[in-house]
Amino acid sequence: TEVTFKVGEGSSGKS
């Protein structure tokens, strides 16, 4: 999940 931040899919909520 913490790796998904690069994509910003929303899993990390970095979108």
UniProtKB/Swiss-Prot annotation:
Keywords for this protein: Allergen
Family: Belongs to the expansin family. Expansin B subfamily.
Protein's name in the database: Pollen allergen Ory s 2-A
Record organism: Oryza sativa subsp. japonica
